[in-house]
């Protein structure tokens, strides 16, 4: 068997429907769109979620909640993520961004106590949870606000 002798299995390669290419094709004339009306026109048809005039689901369901524009977005970093830093490293927002631990828009960064710390880090400009503070200080690190 050679490469040029290979052919796809029967029915695996379906031909596309070429509409509007003459009456002999069986799809000429109205091009499978029917006679006149909104759905025959260019740009015709219904929008996604249209239910035939029935009140659509997104309008039947009640509105809930609101977006608080004063809310502060706080990104979370766990102690287990900080192993990549060297001993006695100063960890601040810029250092976390540089290593790829935090991305995007945010107001503050908070260090949480999930994981263990074996190195003495100095944290700057970070919020720190109680358990994280205990683990950092036990490892000989410090926190500067």
Curated annotation (Swiss-Prot):
Part of the 50S ribosomal subunit. Residues 1-58 are annotated as: Disordered. Binds to the 23S rRNA. PROSITE patterns: RIBOSOMAL_L15 (PS00475). GO terms for molecular function: rRNA binding; structural constituent of ribosome. Keywords: Ribonucleoprotein, Ribosomal protein, RNA-binding, rRNA-binding. Belongs to the universal ribosomal protein uL15 family. Residues 21-31, 42-52 have a biased composition (Gly residues). Gene3D superfamilies: 3.100.10.10. GO terms for cellular component: cytosolic large ribosomal subunit. Pfam families: Ribosomal_L27A. One of its GO terms (biological process) is translation. This is Large ribosomal subunit protein uL15. SUPFAM superfamilies: Ribosomal proteins L15p and L18e.
